[in-house]
Amino acid sequence: MSMPATSTKTTKLATSLIDEYALLGWRAMLTEVNLSPKPGLVDRINCGAHKDMALEDFHRSALAIQGWLPRFIEFGACSAEIAPEAVLHGLRPIGMACEGDMFRATAGVNTHKGSIFSLGLLCAAIGRLLQLNQPVTPTTVCSTAASFCRGLTDRELRTNNSQLTAGQRLYQQLGLTGARGEAEAGYPLVINHALPHYLTLLDQGLDPELALLDTLLLLMAINGDTNVASRGGEGGLRWLQREAQTLLQKGGIRTPADLDYLRQFDRECIERNLSPGGSADLLILTWFLAQI
């Protein structure tokens, strides 16, 4: 694996520490995809609303991405002395190379493109914080990642071009900023909602898988998921948010018996061809940040 040219600065970080964070990123991706049952998403039970990917694709993809996570951390450390707004430009070639390995591992299937963006940002933020001898906490990591993305939504979503990307179209039609907006804001859905919710459930003694499933429902209820909107429009997104909110209001996922509600929700998502991939990406970040 060749590393794109990124910086001439050297890092003082221990390889073991870098590898430890990279391993957490890999475990976060595996934890999410193996979590079952998940409405509309690939898991151990079925392929959700996806006909082009399976569980094994995600396992291969996560392994391919793990090899690149140290590069994001290293670049974050090596670029610690430059303005944060300039970091994203240097991260892009690493992300593109990582994406290439993902596609090679899955024979062209897009399993984790969103996670390459979000985990890459968080890993770079961790590298920067470590290099500057600053505390590595969920809040500092996400605020540092946000500083890398300052102005990103304006630059990439606000355009008058006739040839719009899917993200630009959803922004113009529905005002959804997707992964870019969440990153630029410092991942508030994770920091202010999903992470405290998940940690509270764990503190209450709830089984970790049930706690993650309940946290996924919370994310589905509040996230303007562009993956869902691109498949089902505004109506599909509002339906999914309402269904998730209804399950939470009924008590959420607290016992194995509650999994029947998720299985029914899964069947309905498959029938409507809806997959909350954006919320799945945020769940990966939630688990990852809970470990640091």
Swiss-Prot record:
One of its GO terms (biological process) is prosthetic group biosynthetic process. InterPro entries: CitG, TriPribosyl-deP-CoA_syn_CitG. GO terms for molecular function: ATP binding; triphosphoribosyl-dephospho-CoA synthase activity. Coiled coil: none annotated. It holds the Pfam family CitG. Its EC number is 2.4.2.52. Transmembrane segments: none annotated. HAMAP family: CitG (MF_00397). Belongs to the CitG/MdcB family. This is Probable 2-(5''-triphosphoribosyl)-3'-dephosphocoenzyme-A synthase. It comes from Shigella sonnei (strain Ss046). The lineage of its organism: Bacteria, Pseudomonadati, Pseudomonadota, Gammaproteobacteria, Enterobacterales.
